[in-house]
């Protein structure tokens, strides 16, 4: 078996565990391949079926060497599939696809992963020499800006054909940044459990440690920018987290504020008001506890 499930368990303060869980789900996400263009299709599957299956590809187990750059949005990626059925072909697998990292300065083609031959993408109908089946498509990670400069850099594309088909479908492409979460995490009562998968063709420990390194960086920035708006709640009704210095009433309406003030003794939930003096908050102490827990997760990786 090329795939193995495993889990990491770490105990922490419940507020710290909740904060880390939400930060993972917010920041450790992989963009979907939702910008797809079918150039040629004579298979039994319609274009929409091809694009739906491509959008859901588990790209984290393919672009693993670039996971830090991907989640930090420092690069994009794309795939290109061009396959014509031959007499002995009965299916298309993920190994039939070419995979590319797109950086501002270069386009990098990934080395083939032979184990992907075991992951089926499409089954051909019975081979007939007079009616061969062909599929050619390209798909880009969500957020990729498709323009002439990029298309001209992608030497594997027939520029004229791609531009013609892209013009026909670009209006239906989502403008939202669409992502998926490549593992599962729960944190009931401070007990963090992370459920992941290992694959034989890459070092899962290095991969996940790269993700945690980025998580520590983005959390550091977020805590450094943490601030609770002060206002007079007798005059104004807050919509975001806020604090009334006169009454020592805090309104909690975001995850970071909730976790920080809970860490320092408040017992609150989102969308609630509480009597609490925020002078007891020390974000450096909170940040230190977060980093300690992430380091424990890091050490538990094997």
Curated annotation (Swiss-Prot):
<dbReference type="InterPro" id="IPR005059">
    <property type="entry name" value="DNA-dir_RNA_pol_35kDa_poxviral"/>
</dbReference>
<keyword id="KW-0946">Virion</keyword>
<comment type="subunit">
    <text>The DNA-dependent RNA polymerase used for intermediate and late genes expression consists of eight subunits 147 kDa, 133 kDa, 35 kDa, 30 kDa, 22 kDa, 19 kDa, 18 kDa and 7 kDa totalling more than 500 kDa in mass. The same holoenzyme, with the addition of the transcription-specificity factor RAP94, is used for early gene expression.</text>
</comment>
<keyword id="KW-0240">DNA-directed RNA polymerase</keyword>
<dbReference type="GO" id="GO:0000428">
    <property type="term" value="C:DNA-directed RNA polymerase complex"/>
</dbReference>
<keyword id="KW-0548">Nucleotidyltransferase</keyword>
<keyword id="KW-0808">Transferase</keyword>
<comment type="function">
    <text>Part of the DNA-dependent RNA polymerase which catalyzes the transcription of viral DNA into RNA using the four ribonucleoside triphosphates as substrates. Responsible for the transcription of early, intermediate and late genes. DNA-dependent RNA polymerase associates with the early transcription factor (ETF) thereby allowing the early genes transcription. Late transcription, and probably also intermediate transcription, require newly synthesized RNA polymerase.</text>
</comment>
<dbReference type="GO" id="GO:0044423">
    <property type="term" value="C:virion component"/>
</dbReference>
<dbReference type="GO" id="GO:0003677">
    <property type="term" value="F:DNA binding"/>
</dbReference>
<dbReference type="GO" id="GO:0003899">
    <property type="term" value="F:DNA-directed RNA polymerase activity"/>
</dbReference>
<protein>
    <recommendedName>
        <fullName>DNA-directed RNA polymerase 35 kDa subunit</fullName>
        <ecNumber>2.7.7.6</ecNumber>
    </recommendedName>
</protein>
<comment type="similarity">
    <text>Belongs to the poxviridae DNA-directed RNA polymerase 35 kDa subunit family.</text>
</comment>
<dbReference type="GO" id="GO:0019083">
    <property type="term" value="P:viral transcription"/>
</dbReference>
<keyword id="KW-0804">Transcription</keyword>
<dbReference type="Pfam" id="PF03396">
    <property type="entry name" value="Pox_RNA_pol_35"/>
</dbReference>
């Amino acid at each position: 078996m090329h795939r193995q499930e495993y889990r990491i368990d770490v105990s922490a303060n419940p507020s710290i565990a909740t904060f880390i869980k939400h930060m993972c789900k917010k920041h450790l996400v992989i963009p979907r391949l939702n910008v797809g263009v079918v150039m040629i299709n004579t298979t039994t599957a319609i274009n929409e079926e091809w694009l739906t299956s491509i959008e859901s590809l588990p790209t984290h187990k393919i672009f693993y060497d670039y996971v830090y750059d991907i989640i930090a949005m420092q690069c994009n990626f794309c795939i290109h599939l061009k396959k014509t059925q031959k007499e002995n072909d009965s299916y298309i697998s993920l190994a039939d696809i070419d995979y590319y990292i797109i950086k501002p300065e270069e386009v990098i083609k990934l080395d083939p992963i032979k184990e992907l031959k075991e992951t089926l993408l499409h089954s051909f109908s019975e081979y007939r020499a007079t009616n061969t089946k062909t599929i050619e498509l390209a798909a880009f990670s969500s957020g990729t800006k498709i323009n002439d400069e990029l298309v001209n850099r992608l030497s594997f594309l027939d520029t004229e054909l791609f531009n013609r088909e892209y013009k026909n479908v670009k209006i239906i492409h989502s403008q939202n940044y669409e992502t998926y979460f490549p593992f599962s995490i729960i944190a009931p009562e401070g007990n963090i459990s992370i459920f992941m998968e290992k694959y034989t063709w890459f070092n899962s420990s290095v991969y996940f440690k790269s993700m945690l390194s980025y998580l520590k960086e983005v959390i550091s920035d977020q805590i450094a920018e943490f601030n609770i708006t002060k206002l007079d709640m007798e005059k104004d009704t807050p919509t975001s987290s806020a604090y009334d210095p006169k009454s020592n009433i805090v309104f909690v309406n975001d995850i970071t504020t909730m976790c920080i003030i809970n860490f320092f003794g408040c017992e609150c939930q989102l969308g609630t008001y509480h009597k609490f003096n925020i002078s007891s908050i020390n974000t450096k102490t909170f940040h230190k506890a977060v980093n300690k827990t992430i380091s424990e997760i890091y050490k538990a990786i094997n």
